[in-house]
Amino acid sequence: KFNKKNRGFEGLAWKADDRMLFVAKERRPSKIFIYQLSPDLLSVKQATIPEELNDIRINDISGLAFNNESLMILSDESRNLLKFNLTEMSFIEMLDLTKGNHSLTSDLPQPEGIVTLSDESIYVASEPDILAKFVPNK
């Protein structure tokens, strides 16, 4: 049975090259934890979190994804997708997931899942039964 005041872990992302696991705490406060796994993946230690990554200006975190050197941070309540570059330690892009932006004909009502592909396309899953695709400008 789930607690109605669920504020726990909400998203995971994996950076295979560095064996780093990113874990998102949904809210109060929204926070991202980073864990470094050993080469055999049998032990783990918490990694230092960049200050810039803790300065997230969104209401909640509903999903994470990793692509190239960027961590994608999805917010259900803010209806935004933030892109944080781990090399430059800065937020480099934001997608507004509301009507009129990026060819959306309506708001994504409850974006909760995200995946990025090697061509940098982004898929966002939203309740009820919506799958939106975003293609980067070339």
What positions do the PLM features span?
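Sequence/structural signature of beta-propeller domains
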Residues: 1-138
